[in-house]
Curated annotation (Swiss-Prot):
Species assigned in the record: Streptococcus gordonii (strain Challis / ATCC 35105 / BCRC 15272 / CH1 / DL1 / V288)
Protein name listed in UniProt: UDP-N-acetylmuramoylalanine--D-glutamate ligase
EC number(s) on file: 6.3.2.9
A Pfam family hit: MurD-like_N
NCBIfam families for this protein: murD
Length: 450
């Protein structure tokens, strides 16, 4: 690890636990910092806080008392889910206490180079594809970041021969100062998380932070299907490598049905292991990164053709009576569901949609819904989703939860049909996260299998 001495005896407040906060607290303690952890969940309901206390780390739980900041902290490591308008964060900044997130901490100690991936959709799939291609090419890609493996935990054991392949959320990227990936990917951008960021402009600015410290020796991989990316390409010091499914670019692109990099044919669309136009984009981004890292074409093709997807990301679950089930619980916005539907024949699809009501209308989804066999609709946003279904001429049933929806969808299906969970909404009206929602769909599938 690098910069070990710089944390010795430094007073650090870790604000918020979850996986990243717990990992950051342990790392800082290991580095010799004087660590205090503050989490809003009561101590008796907080196994992570209990565990840290047993290890000798000071914990303050059940709220965020402002007087805690009177203890002369020299650094705050903030859980990315805690917004910058939180009173503790505001007070820390007023007191000139540096506020970073756990990924910045990971960068400061990492001996391994970093490839960072962000975007509204496709982050996890692209991150996983890249890590698998690098590893197959002998470069040992280590998954980390917003993909379930805390970056600071992975960075501790990484060496210079490894590569940290880091999925990064807008929440995490707001808290970077020195963070410097050698390659960065922005898969796409669309309005999401506006309840956290306030506006699309602020959200986009957070994503754009990924290239903040990059130089001409670094590479920024951008989706030239989007005008936003084309417009921003001149606003970075990094060397831009584009990818596109709609035009030939100086990077990765679709030439007929062949994914190509600067004239070199890599793989046909039909040979990619996961369906959908969005996965073609994910594969193109992966190809761009792989070629920049010197991976040979055959290795790239073998990994992409064998790629089985990621849990909850258009995951093929299996079949019951020749009815296929796909779990796309990670589709928490309209674009993600549009991409999912693009991979199927609508006349065979029974779509399960709906979830947290963020006030969005679904007019943009109407063309993509046309021709669906049926929909099963649930959640707070059901009235808005139903309006879109009515406009598309698609009939629907109501469901109380995902399990109920899966059973009702299967009852409507015939051999050869597809039951697709792709909600186009966040999960928090019913479930703590999209993983729990997707897991309930998987449980329903097992029930239907008998």
């Amino acid at each position: 690890m690098k910069n070990i001495a710089s944390f010795a005896n430094k007073k650090v407040l870790v604000l918020g636990l979850a996986k990243s906060g717990e990992s950051a607290a342990r790392l800082l303690d290991k580095l010799g910092a004087i660590v205090t952890v503050n989490d809003g969940k009561p101590f008796e309901e907080n196994p992570a806080a209990q565990s840290l206390l047993e290890e000798g780390i000071k914990v303050v739980t059940g709220g965020h008392p402002l007087e805690l900041l009177d203890e002369n902290f020299e650094l705050m490591v903030k859980n990315p889910g805690i917004p910058y308008n939180n009173a503790m964060v505001i007070r820390a900044l007023e007191k000139k206490i540096p506020v970073i997130t756990e990924v910045e901490l990971a960068y400061l100690i990492s001996e391994a180079p970093i490839i960072g991936i962000t975007g509204s959709n496709g982050k996890t799939t692209t991150t996983t594809m890249i890590a698998q291609v690098l590893t197959a090419g002998g470069q040992n890609g280590l998954l980390s970041g917003n993909i379930g493996f805390p970056a600071s935990q992975v960075a501790q054991s990484a060496c210079g021969k490894d590569t940290l392949v880091m999925e990064l959320s807008s929440f995490q990227l707001m808290g970077i100062e020195a963070f410097h990936p050698q390659i960065a990917v922005i898969t796409n951008l669309m309005p999401t998380h506006l309840d956290y960021h306030g506006s699309f402009e602020e959200y986009a600015a957070a994503k754009w932070n990924i290239q903040k410290n990059m130089t001409a020796d670094d590479y920024l991989v951008l989706n030239f299907n989007q005008d936003w990316a084309k417009g921003m390409a001149s606003q970075t010091q990094a060397t831009v490598v584009p990818f596109s499914t709609t035009e030939k670019v100086d990077g990765a692109y679709l030439d007929g049905d062949v994914l190509t990099f600067r004239g070199e044919a890599i793989i046909k669309v039909a040979e990619i292991g996961v369906p959908g136009s969005h996965n073609v984009e994910n594969a193109l981004a992966t190809i761009a990164v792989a070629k920049l890292r010197g991976i040979d074409n055959q290795t790239i093709k073998e990994v992409l053709s064998a790629f089985g997807g990621v849990k909850h990301r258009l995951q093929y679950v299996g079949q019951v009576n020749e009815v296929a089930f796909y779990n796309d619980s990670k589709s928490t916005n309209i674009l993600a569901t549009q991409k999912a539907l693009s991979g199927f024949d609508n006349s065979k699809v029974i779509l399960i949609a709906g979830g947290l009501d963020r006030g969005n209308e679904f007019d943009e989804l109407v063309p993509d819904l046309k021709g669906l066999k049926k929909m099963v609709i649930l959640g707070q946003s059901a009235p808005r989703v139903k309006r879109a279904a009515d406009q598309a001429g698609v009939s629907y049933l109501d469901a109380t939860d995902v399990r109920d929806a899966a059973h009702k969808a299967f009852a409507l299906a015939e051999p050869g049909d597809i039951v697709l969970l792709s909600p186009a909404n966040a999960s928090w009206d019913m479930y703590s996260n999209f993983e729990v929602r997707g897991d309930e769909f998987l449980v329903a599938f097992e029930e239907l299998k008998g």
